[in-house]
Amino acid sequence: MFIAGIDGGGTHTRIEIRDIENNLLRREEFGPFNINSIGEDAFRKLLREVFASCGEMADCKKICFGAAGISNPRVGEILEEELNAAGFVGKWKRCGDQEIALRGAMDTPGVAVIAGTGSICFGKNEAGETARSGGYGHLIDDGGSGYALGRDVISAAVRALDGRGQGKALLDAVYAQLNASTSAQIVSFVYSPNTDKSAIAEFARIALDQAAAGEETARAILNRGAEELQALVAAVQNRLDLADCPIALLGGLISSENIYRRAVVEKLSELGTPIAPAHDALWGAAQMAYEME
C-alpha cells in the first residue's frame, strides 16, 4: 500500500511515493503536465506513464495532484477517467501549484509568494482559511515575474534606442542575447509565434546582471518587480488577517541568492518574516495526500 503526491509543471512532472506510514519510498520525474501545452492525448499518455511507474494503482490509498491550471473541469474529467482505468479505488484530490508550494514551505499559518516565469501568492491562516492573489497570466498580470522583468528589459531597450530613456546597456545586452543589431530584429523576435512567455522571461537575467553592475534602469525594473510581489503578499495578508507572518519565497527568480531576491526580501520584511521553504512543492503534494481524510 502507498500514497502519492504529484507536482505537475510546464516542463516536467514529479511524483513522490510514500508508504502508508508516510515514509519516503522514491521520487521520479516525467515530461510536462500542462494540457494546454501538450494536448489531451499527450496528457493522457503522461498520466498512464506516471501511474505505471507507481506499480499497482489498486494499492494506492491516496493521491494528490498539484499543478497550475488543474481546476480546469476537463482536466478533472481526464484525471478521473485515467485513475479509474488504472484500477485506482482510493481517495484523490487536485489543487493549485501554489497550494502544494505553501504546504511544502511551512507547517504554520503563513504566505508563499512564487516568482518564476509567472507569479502568484497563496496564504493560509490559523482558521484554515485560504486566499490567493495574482496568477492571472502574463497578458494581464504576473507582476514581479520573470516574464514581467524580461518584458520590461526589452521595453527599456527599445525606448533607449529611440532616445526615450536611458538603458543603453540594456539595449546592448538584448542585442547580444538575440545576436541582433536592429530594432526590426527585436520586434521580429518578440512577435514571432515561436516566442512564448518563457522566451521573454529569459531576458530577466539581463536585469539582474545589469542591476548588479549598477545600471539604474535595471535597478528600477527590479524595484518595480519587488513592489509587485510585495503587493501580492499584502493582498493575501489583508484578506486573512495575517500581519507579520512567515513569508516563503519560491520560484526560480527568488528561491536562491541574487540581487532581485535581496530587493524582494527588503520589501517583504515590511510585512513579515521572509523565510526559505522547509520543503519543496512535491513534498507538499505528498504531505497533502497523507493528510487527506
What do the predicted segments below correspond to?
Residues 1-61, 82-85, 105-111, 154-293:
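ATP-binding/phosphotransfer module of carbohydrate and carboxylate kinases, centering on a glycine-rich
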Residues 68:
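ABC-type ATPase nucleotide-binding domain
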Residues 71-168:
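Phosphate-binding/catalytic loop of phosphoryl-transfer enzymes
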